[in-house]
Amino acid sequence: MGPVQQSVPKASIVIPSKNGGALLGVALQRIFGQSTPWPFEVIVVDSGSAAASLEILRGFPVRLHAVEPTAFNHGLTRDLGASLARGEHLVFLNQDVVPCDDRWLLTLLEPLEQGEEYAAVQGAIREFPDRPRFYWDSGGARFYFTRESERWIHGHGGIGFSTVNAAIRRAIWEACPFGDAVFMEDKKWQHAAAARGFRIAYQSDAAAFHTHNYDMPALVRRCQQEGFGWRLLGETYSCTDMLRDTLSPAKYGDLWRGLRAGHVRTVAEVLFPFIRPWLVFRGNRLCRRYPA
């Protein structure tokens, strides 16, 4: 059936955006090409896009809601989008995420449609096959090799909940919204949901493409933000953790193989296994404010 016209939507897809550009247009084209037996809607909460990106958004039947750039907050902005939604299920996507096929939405919501067992669903995240990408990837164990990430996933049923590609039952969100979160709104929500006994399903076939290609400043900022975000969640990354992760040998063999094959090309890619532990530690223990 596809995008909603007048009928009440089964799902509301919420996308925070700012200068999403051409890739957001590709994502929306794939979203509005979804094959579903029920209607859905797309809500974009935009925080200050330039005219070119706004023109792309207006080329699609999205419900566009604007907020001031200074008002953007990873948790509260998603809550705003959810509050505008009419669907039974809330789907959260980043603006640079493209569903892999036309059954992504239907597959993502299957666990929620089949009964009341699950409160939320985590979709799979894959790297774009045809875009430049950071050697260490950006959404898996090779990037998140440090112990705080391992501890979190181990303590939460093997899932690190991510609003890059996820769905939450609307009634559950109403009882457990994201709240104020400058970063890691998804992990904050996961922690609160687990405390209430809510379960999250993993749908490997509900996959979407998402790739980062970090330069050095972006990499430093990202890793420090993670450390700071863990601190806000009460997770400690100690000096001992940092030293053990720095000295762990497996990633250096991976680095050597990447260098020999010519896949490691940038300074950021060379330094990543050495500096990620320190940067996470710095964000977690030393930064007094969010490292923007």
Predicted regions located by residue number:
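A conserved acidic beta->alpha catalytic loop
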Residues: 46-54, 97-98
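Glycine-rich, basic loop-to-helix element that forms the pyrophosphate-binding segment
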Residues: 68-85
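Short aromatic/hydrophobic "clamp" motif used to bind/position activated sugar donors
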Residues: 90
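Conserved donor NDP-sugar-binding/catalytic core segment of glycosyltransferases
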Residues: 98-135
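Short, flexible, basic/aromatic active-site loop/helix in glycosyltransferases
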Residues: 123-124, 139-158
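A recurrent flexible, glycine/aromatic-enriched loop bordering the glycosyltransferase active site
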Residues: 149-168, 182
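Acidic donor-binding loop at a coil-to-helix junction in glycosyltransferase catalytic cores
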Residues: 183-191
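Non-catalytic, C-terminal membrane-associated alpha-helical segments of glycosyltransferases
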Residues: 221-292
